[in-house]
Amino acid sequence: MTYFIDVPTMSDLVHDIGVAPFIGELAAALRDDFKRWQAFDKSARVASHSEVGVIELMPVADKSRYAFKYVNGHPANTARNLHTVMAFGVLADVDSGYPVLLSELTIATALRTAATSLMAAQALARPNARKMALIGNGAQSEFQALAFHKHLGIEEIVAYDTDPLATAKLIANLKEYSGLTIRRASSVAEAVKGVDIITTVTADKAYATIITPDMLEPGMHLNAVGGDCPGKTELHADVLRNARVFVEYEPQTRIEGEIQQLPADFPVVDLWRVLRGETEGRQSDSQVTVFDSVGFALEDYTVLRYVLQQAEKRGMGTKIDLVPWVEDDPKDLFSHTRGRAGKRRIRRVA
């Protein structure tokens, strides 16, 4: 049978582990998987674009497990009281093709995105970084803030969003963390002045130039998260030209990332090579580094495996007959049309 993790179960799982420990453990798992980069069968995500958003499938596999994520991006959804990003994913056994996990990934995507940002910053930011600007205070902002506060030593966050209510929500959600100071800014320029790290996590599908070259200061690390599809950017092109730029999966980032603005031969560095020690990350304390983060399927593979391990360990989730299993005659599919006496087979793990 297939493990099934719905939103309430994922919520319970994250609460049981703790948001910050979840992100920290996941960042370590991501680092391990990025270090075995060449073991994976990789491809860019398959995207279906419309005027109002995008729907994507993100596949990846190694020799034992295949994973994919279904995810959307619809920036105007909040006006209809809907989420901008929603996702679910599957982890399957390569030997048999059977799905071993069907899971919600909306909550988990925010966690894995924060964990990926953390993993990159641990490798690229200056070790004495203590102050971060957080531009875009929507659904993913708290996860990014906690990742950098709990695991990188960020003590002060200067927050800015075009919607003041989003910033108020961020501050309210994180008020219990006494070691973290969150201050409002009235503009992007005010938010980024004097910080060590800039995290941009905005949602508008537009060629935006939220961060401009005049805002850069020596030694900054930029964690550019929001630009993740064609026609959607956050950084002025000259910001990239004045920085050392790191990417997840270059063929995908060339299409969807900040570097879509630049020629195809603009030099970038594979993050996995830095993590493996094959190439340099930050080359000096004064260098500006950019993590051009678009989100890659390997990160979803990692979070699906982590969720399955943690759910099994805690006896959480349900098991469902998503496909016919071993007790059925594999040559008699027609028997499944007889209704099985109307019984729906869903079994709570614990």
UniProtKB/Swiss-Prot annotation:
Protein name: Ornithine cyclodeaminase
Record keywords, A-Z: Amino-acid biosynthesis, Lyase, NAD, Nucleotide-binding
GO molecular function annotation: nucleotide binding; ornithine cyclodeaminase activity
Biotech exploitation of the protein: Can be used for biotechnological production of L-proline when heterologously overexpressed in C.glutamicum.
Binding-site residues, L-ornithine: R45, K69, R112, D228, V294
Family designation: Belongs to the ornithine cyclodeaminase/mu-crystallin family.
Binding positions (NAD(+)): T84, R112, A139, Q140, D161, T202, V225, G226, G227, D228, K232, S293, K331
Active site: D228
EC class: lyase
Cofactor-binding details, from the entry: Binds 1 NAD(+) pers subunit.
GO biological process: L-proline biosynthetic process
One Pfam family hit: OCD_Mu_crystall
PANTHER family reported for this sequence: KETIMINE REDUCTASE MU-CRYSTALLIN (PTHR13812:SF19)
Lineage: superkingdom: Bacteria
Pathway per the UniProt entry: Amino-acid biosynthesis; L-proline biosynthesis; L-proline from L-ornithine: step 1/1
Subunit structure: Homodimer.
EC numbers: 4.3.1.12
Catalytic activity of the protein: L-ornithine = L-proline + NH4(+)
Role this protein plays: Catalyzes the conversion of L-ornithine into L-proline with release of ammonia. Is likely involved in the L-ornithine degradation pathway that allows P.putida to utilize this compound as sole carbon and nitrogen source.
Transmembrane intervals: none
Names of the cofactor(s): NAD(+)
